[in-house]
């Protein structure tokens, strides 16, 4: 098994390099977004939503690139039920996430019409929203603002398919860790314009 794995890795590393040093790519992407609580920074949880972003890549070598990313996402409104002393009540929550990040990526498979990459970015992100919480029968409900800014660390992997000399389509998965808030997972489709 180790021998087969070694042969596969050797083949991948020996694949001809088709991305050119100095080449740039501009991409727009969007897709499904879900949130994961890391600690317990707020009451309740958020429903899945959608995210949208722009990314620029500049190839430093034939495989390694520098990337800059602008991103925005939302839960598209969350409602949930809670059993309380006054009966079943509906609580609501809402959030919008924004971030800017930069980092390095690597095309580990690079063919003429296909490439697969991994990337890691760091930056700053902010959350703007609120959560609702039932306190007691006498107090009732409380709306807690969720406005936080924190460092951001992202890791992602994706695939790109060249459909012409200047255009690529593809998909990607990204995990974003927003330090003092939570994490999010995104599966997106994207389209890229290649500048030679």
Residue spans for each PLM region:
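Positively charged n-region of N-terminal signal peptides that target proteins for export
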Residues: 1-4, 19-20
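Sec-dependent N-terminal signal peptides
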Residues: 4-13
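Short glycine/proline- and aromatic-enriched beta-strand/turn motifs that initiate or cap beta-hairpins
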Residues: 19-60, 64-69, 186-188, 192-196
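Residues that define the transmembrane beta-barrel architecture of outer-membrane proteins
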Residues: 22-24, 46-52, 94-100, 114, ...
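Transmembrane beta-strands of outer-membrane beta-barrel pores
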Residues: 30-36, 70-76, 122-128, 175-179, ...
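Flexible, solvent-exposed loop segments that connect beta-strands
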Residues: 35-45, 71-98, 126-151
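Residues on the lipid-exposed face of transmembrane beta-strands in outer-membrane beta-barrel proteins
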Residues: 52-58, 100-106, 120-124, 155-161, ...
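Repeated loop/turn-to-beta-strand initiation elements of outer-membrane beta-barrel proteins
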Residues: 62-66, 112-114, 161-169
